[in-house]
């Protein structure tokens, strides 16, 4: 499965990591991924953004901020995680989300922009395995 990154030297990945097809990490700043993290297909993790003003953008001005993904996080397919974001432990990010702000631990969050929907609870436990 293809994996793409800018450098790779600024990426730290914990134990038991799963990254699906077409994972792209633009690591102009540090990217820290915790233990037991699942990342779905076609996910982009971008620490860098171009300037908003045309003169700065044309001059190549960019800004980079770190991204931290906690332990036991699941990021669904086709998500984008933007610069400066922290995703807390045990959180689930729904497919197709654009994460532009910090997401706390232990919640289900999705949307564009991504927002907290509810906490992850024992009611979410799967009791019948198919």
Model-inferred region functions:
Residues 88-91, 104-106:
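Conserved catalytic segment of ABC-fold P-loop ATPases
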């Amino acid at each position: 499965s293809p994996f793409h990154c800018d450098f790779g030297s600024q990426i730290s990945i914990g134990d038991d990591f799963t990254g699906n097809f077409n994972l792209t990490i633009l690591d102009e700043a540090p990217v820290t991924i915790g233990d037991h993290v699942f990342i779905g297909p076609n996910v982009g993790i971008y620490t860098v953004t171009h300037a908003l003003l045309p003169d700065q953008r044309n001059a190549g001005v960019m800004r980079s901020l770190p991204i931290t993904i906690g332990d036991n996080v699941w990021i669904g397919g086709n998500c984008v995680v933007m610069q400066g974001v922290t995703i807390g432990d045990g959180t689930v990010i729904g497919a197709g989300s654009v994460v532009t702000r910090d997401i706390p631990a232990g919640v289900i969050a999705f949307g564009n922009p991504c927002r907290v929907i509810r906490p992850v609870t024992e009611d979410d436990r799967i009791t019948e395995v198919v």
